[in-house]
């Protein structure tokens, strides 16, 4: 039997995704739930989740109450530990360079706000504990659904060891997103199963309407961040359903997905030959821009974020087509002093046609959208399979951009420094 969510559930699921995260976001605050009530409810829902998920409880799920201030501090501390130093700021600079987020965005502040907006609870795989905020009324249907989601994470941890999974790989966002999608997608589908069994006859669409209100931080966040935030739940659930239908529900945990390409195209995960990402090295190990230059950020973007980059510029159809056939990629950002930067990005594609489609679409995106105010059409020249945009050349503030294609590969260079522009890898 093919598993599919009933149509009436999608509105509620969409609303829930604005409420649930690694630290699940707020449900209705009501009367304070005491420890005895929490003990009873967690034990009850744990049994129900275990039965629905088909994973026996190996041990009782530990849980504790926290004040709201303690829980918010916990989330901030976890973010600082998993994204150390200026990692977030360097990610922000890259995202702005390629046009993913507006230049006014403060990525650290926005991310912290998203993770702490009306925080209600979370499961911590390091301690194996479920934390619930004081004053969180666990008797509401919404609260029980969110508890079911987080208890599913506890079960995943007991059986598959979440702490060993690559959820915070600093140099491969695509791998981390694929891993998160398996974990969150599974818990999201469990939550839907729990909801369907426990809350039959309720006006779930009305509940969805109430839940989607009051998400001021989420609504004000850049579209790129909102989509990334929701992707592991929505697309992850569809991936888990596909895996369950084709193989079994635990297959993604026995051998984790390794790319968002596999999440978006489950047949590339469940097929007889998994389509694994190509390992790409953007620059040779001995590449150097000279004195004063420092490599500040290296990462993998992946199919999902490539498609999303086009989507936020109202090119969703073009982006989906351009991102299809992704084989692998890697970028590196170099910076010097306060202003100079040089961005290098190499992508590999399944076919030469895939590479050509990406090159053409990216040229349109940068020329007509991202950098349309920075140069005139006369600045853009085409030579063979390379597109060059050198700006006016009057100052080091002018952007220089190169998109070059060779067979299955597309190489991108963006810099505001003439020396870096002339230094080719």
PLM segments and residue spans:
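Pan-zinc metallopeptidase signature
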Residues: 216-340, 354
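Short pre-active-site segment immediately N-terminal to the catalytic Zn-binding motif
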Residues: 130-148, 178
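Catalytic zinc-binding patch centered on the HExxH motif and its immediate surroundings
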Residues: 73-86, 107-128
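Short helix/loop segments within enzyme catalytic domains
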Residues: 189-215, 244-257
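C-terminal soluble interaction/assembly domains
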Residues: 327-425
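A metal-dependent hydrolase signature that marks the N-terminal structural subdomain at the beginning
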Residues: 27-105
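Post-HExxH zinc-binding segment in Zn-dependent metallohydrolases
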Residues: 45, 157-208
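Acidic helix-start/capping segments at beta-turn-to-alpha-helix junctions
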Residues: 58-78, 168-174, 207-214, 257-261
């Amino acid at each position: 039997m093919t598993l599919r969510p009933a149509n009436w559930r999608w509105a509620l699921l969409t609303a829930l995704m604005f409420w649930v995260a690694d630290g699940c976001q707020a449900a209705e605050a009501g009367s304070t739930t005491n420890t005895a009530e929490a003990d009873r409810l967690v034990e009850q829902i744990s049994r129900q989740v275990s039965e629905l998920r088909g994973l026996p409880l190996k041990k009782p799920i530990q849980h504790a109450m926290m004040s709201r201030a303690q829980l918010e501090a916990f989330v901030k501390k976890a973010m600082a530990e998993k994204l150390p130093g200026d990692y977030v700021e360097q990610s922000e600079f890259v995202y702005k360079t390629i046009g993913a987020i507006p230049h006014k965005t403060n990525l650290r502040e926005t991310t912290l706000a998203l993770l702490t907006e009306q925080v209600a609870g979370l499961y911590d795989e390091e301690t194996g504990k479920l934390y619930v905020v004081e004053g969180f009324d666990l008797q509401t249907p919404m609260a029980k659904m969110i508890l079911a989601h987080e208890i599913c994470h506890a079960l995943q941890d007991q059986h598959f060891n979440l702490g060993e999974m690559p959820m915070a790989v600093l140099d491969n966002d695509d791998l981390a997103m694929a891993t998160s999608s398996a974990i969150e997608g599974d818990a999201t589908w469990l939550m839907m199963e729990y909801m369907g069994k426990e809350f039959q006859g309720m006006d779930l669409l009305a509940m969805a309407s109430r839940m989607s209100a009051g998400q001021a931080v989420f609504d004000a966040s850049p579209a790129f961040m909102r989509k990334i935030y929701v992707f592991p739940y929505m697309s992850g659930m569809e991936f888990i359903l596909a895996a369950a239908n084709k193989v079994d529900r635990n297959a993604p945990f026995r051998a984790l997905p390794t790319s968002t390409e596999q999440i978006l195209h489950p047949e590339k995960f469940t097929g007889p030959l998994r389509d694994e990402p190509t390992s790409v090295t953007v620059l040779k190990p001995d590449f150097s821009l000279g004195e004063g230059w420092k490599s500040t950020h290296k990462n993998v973007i992946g199919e999902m974020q490539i498609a999303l980059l086009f989507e936020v510029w109202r090119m969703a159809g073009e982006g989906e087509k351009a991102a299809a056939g992704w084989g692998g990629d890697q970028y590196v950002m170099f910076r010097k002093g306060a202003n100079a930067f040089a961005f290098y990005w190499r992508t590999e594609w399944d076919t030469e046609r895939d590479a050509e489609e990406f090159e053409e679409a990216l040229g349109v995106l940068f020329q007509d959208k991202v950098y349309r105010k920075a140069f005139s059409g006369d600045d853009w020249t085409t030579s063979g399979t390379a597109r060059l945009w050198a700006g006016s050349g009057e100052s080091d503030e002018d952007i220089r951009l190169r998109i070059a294609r060779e067979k299955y590969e597309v190489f991108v260079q963006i810099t505001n420094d003439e020396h870096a522009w002339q230094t080719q890898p």
